[in-house]
Structure formats: C-alpha cells, structure tokens
Amino acid sequence: MQEGEDEDEDETPSQQLAYSLLQHYIQGVEAKDRTVRYRCVQLIALLVNHLPAIDDEVFVELKDLLIRRLHDKESVVRVHAVVALTRLQGAAEEGSEEGQEMFRALVERLKHDPQAEVRRAVLINIEPTTRCLPYILERSRDQDTLTRRAVYLRPMEEVDFRVLKIRDRESLLDHGLEDRDASVRRACANLLSGHWLHLSDDDLIKLLERLDVGNGKVASKALETFFDLYPDILSGLTYEEATWTAMKAEHAFLIRTFTEHCHRHDQTSKLDQVLPDISTQAYFIRNETGEERQELVADELSFILRQFLGIARLADYSDEMGRRNMFTLMRQMLIKLGPEEELIRAVMEVMVRICVDERDFTQTIVEIISDLREEEGGGEDEKGEEEGEEEGNKETKETEKVHRLLKSLEMARCMFENLRGSLQQSTSVPGLLQELVLPAAVHPHLEVREVAVTCLGLACYLDKRLAAQRMELFLHVVRYGHLELQIMALKIVFDLVMLFGFQALSTSLEDPHEIFRLIADCSGEGETTIQTLAVHGVSKLLLADLLDDQQALKSLVLLYFHPSSTDNARLRQCLSFFLQAFGRMAYKNHDRLCEVSLYERGSLLLPYLSLSVTIFL
C-alpha cells in the first residue's frame, strides 16, 4: 500500500480529497489543545482506510507522529492513535523496519498503558500474528473485566487455536472458565463451543485430543461447560461395546466426566444408556490390565485405567453379583499393582464404595498388606538360601524390596485418607502401625521415611490417644530430620494441635511445654522455610484462640518489624494479614497488641539502631 506519487493519476477525486485532508490533519496532531489533537488523530484513523497509497515521506512522518501520540497524556487521544497506527501497520511491508517499530510501540502500550480502554483498543485492533499472540494471551489476566473479555471476543475468534502450544490453550481456557466475572466466563465458553469446536469438525473427541486431558482440570472444566450449554449432548451419548473394548484416553475421560456430571446434578437415570452393568465394567477394567492392551504407552494405559476406576467409584452396587466381581478384581489389582500412588488411590476409592463399612474396608486392606508382606518374607528366605550371589543382583533385589515396602506404605496411606471414623474400635490398625509404619519411619531410604511419617500422621488425626503417644516422634523428626521430613512433621504437629489442643498432646511427654518450646524455636531464627511454616502455624493457633501466650504474640510482632524478615515475602504477607485480623477479632486482642507495641518499643527499635550505627561506622 506504500507507493510513490506516480500513481496519483489513478486516484479518484474522493481519494485525492482524503489525501489532502490527511496532510492537513497531520499539522494538528501535536497541537496544544487536547480537543484538536483528539479530532485530528480520530480523523486520521478514519482516512487511512480510504487511501490506496501513501507517499513514503508522509508515511514516515505520520508513523512518527502517531507513535509519539501513544504517550499523550489524554487517554482518548492514545486510543485513536492506537487505531490509526494499527491500520497504518497494515500498510507497512512485512518485516520492514517501520513495521517492527510500530509493532514494538503497540505491544508496549498493550502491556503497560495505565488506562484499560487503551489496552483494549490495542487488543481489538492489532493483527493477531504468531509473534503477537503471547502478548494477547497475557491480557487474559488483565485487571480490567472488559479487557479480559475482549481477549475471547475479538483476537481469539480470528486465530486457529491449533497454532497455540498446548500449555497456552490450557492457560487461556483456565483463565477464562475460572474468571471471577460471569461475562468473561461466558465469552470463553462461547469461544470454546463455537470457534474451537468448529475447527475440530464439531467433534468433541477431536477437541479433547487437542487439549491435555492428562492434566484433567482444564479439560474437565471445558466438558462441564459443554454439558451446561448443550444439555442435548447428555442424551446423545450411548453405550457402544466396541468403544469400551478399545477405549481411547479422550473417550474414557469424556465418559468419566459425564458420569460425575450426572451424579452432581442428580441425573443418574441417564447413566443407564451410557454405562454397562457392574460385571461388564469389571471385565473391561480387567481387559485394560491384560496383555491385549500392552501396545499402549504405559502413561496412557494408566490414565485410561484411572478413568475406568473413577467411573466404578460412582457406580450403583445394588447388584450383589456385580459387587463381588468388582471386589475380587480390586483385590487382585492391589496385589499386582506397582507403587504408583494415583492408581492405588483410585482402587482404594472403589474399595471404600464396595465394602460394607469402614471396619470391613480397614480389615480388607490390612489383610492385603499382610499378604504382601508375607510373600516378601517368603521370597527373602528362598533367596537367602542361594550362595554366590552377584553384587549387581543384590542391589536389584534391594531396590525391589524398597519398591514393595513403598507399595505397602502407599496402600496404608490411601487407606487412612479414606477413613473418617475413630481407630479405637479397629483391632487391625495397631498391628499395622507396629509392624509396618513405625519401622519404616526409621528406614535409611528417605522416600520410605517420608511416606511412613505421612501414614503415621494420618492415623494420628483419627485417634487422640495415638496422637499423644506418637507426638514425641514427630518432635524428634522436626528437630533432627531431613528438611523435607522436618516440614512434613511440623505440619502434622500443627494439625494435631488444632485438632486436639496442647494439653491433650502433652500427656505422654516428659516436658509438658516441649511442643510450645519447639514451635517457638522454629518460628525464631533458622531455616527460612521452617520459620515461615512455623509462623503460619502460630498465627493460626492465635487466631483460633488455641494459644494464649503473650510471648508468642510478642515474637511475631518483633519478627514483623525485624530487618531480617524483609526478604521473606511469604512470611511478611502472613504477618501483615495476621496482625490486622488478630487486632480486629476481639477487643482483648487489640489491647494485647497495644501492650506489646508500648512495652517493647526498645526491642522494636534496637535492630534498626544497630543497623544505623554499623552503616555510619
């Protein structure tokens, strides 16, 4: 579009008039009067579209003027400067220096302009090229609602979403579907169900193939959006044996999400036309673990299996024969599975539904773990009889032994996670803790110790007496354990204090103040992560009125004002919220804060005085 004056003879009278007006309005672009600047830039934006060619000198002059107007103090001038510049950008040759300069200027306004209407003007008018897309996607987190909505209404409607990376698609949908404003959520849903679905040949499975169903969260939210917008989809799904026999990851994900949607909205009657009976479901789950499906990648096979188990978790087990078949299959799977946490957890959730009650569930899982431990012990006896064993084989067998131990601990952890009642009536759990969990807590392998401490913590949540008995172990881990174990154990200590209180947990300790002393040590000087976690815990205890100690409050106030906490953003954010919330909760809390502030003025000023003297010297 940028050509010389040799084509003036081919211009129509209207185009010649527009060119003359353009040259006239250029003179007012930098006028002192804001109204003149506004009208001149506005009219230039209108005229640029009607000119087939612009002289090179005029083009460069106009480009420089408009770029300067992008920084005009009046936002309305900047808006029309954006419109004019985006239209002028289309006249520049691709890859030219002028085009690059205009692109950089527009992107800078898109990212940093303080007025939302200016950012929105750039967003709506700039050409959504591959180079520009990352900056457009950033606006899905803009603070202005209309700007966030504009991302899904204008530029994304012109883009083939297949040019985006999967993580960008996920991020765009996540920001839109989870937005706090309903209009943004609606715009994102319309983009997904309209433009994106059309580019997928109106096939929901093809659309899921272009999303990361393994992540689950965003794809699940997208399907929920489809089910809400188009309820007829629910009636269109039917049971097809061929599909279940050779199930794909996307189809399994669709059926599992559909099942959860029906249960969530009390539409379980629609499941009969989609799901087979329990015995048939057990058959298909067994088929996924057989050799017939070994051509699939291990991760894909594991994902499909988890979807099947998610469907089975919500099934109706009124059919006794089907329930027994599923119970037998789940028991076999727990024995054959490796230490994969997600699969074990999925099987456990099905077992909870199948078993009569929690006592039956606990007894069943403990028996399975005992069988696994007995098989391990028998295998070790047989191996011990062999002599002349190679060193490499010993290392391999030791690794296998650790894997089997981890599997047993993972099963125990998942069992405790699914329990809601007290452990006092259970006769099998104490033996499991003594024979498996407590020895594993001192195992040389770090991962084994971590899972064992987690198991013990989950068990203590369910039994106050057990928590008091094992509190000394948690305190020991916090003081002398590995950093990751310290964090884990300290979280457990705070959880138990929140559940049962200091007094109930101190009955088995030689020093009844040991728990509080440990917490005070952790919230003082020490490793940053431990200190931050301890401050979070103490703040929660004070807010919940479970800790009534003026010294603890004094420590938090002093820590907030101490220079050493300046670089710890999480710590300062926690204390900023705590000090405001604590003072407003009750009048007595306000008095306590005032007392600390008045009587500890010297302690508050001392670190800053010391710092000033050091700098002066």
Where are each of the predicted segments found?
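Alpha-solenoid helical repeat scaffolds
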Residues: M1-Q143, A150, P155-R162, S318-D319, ...
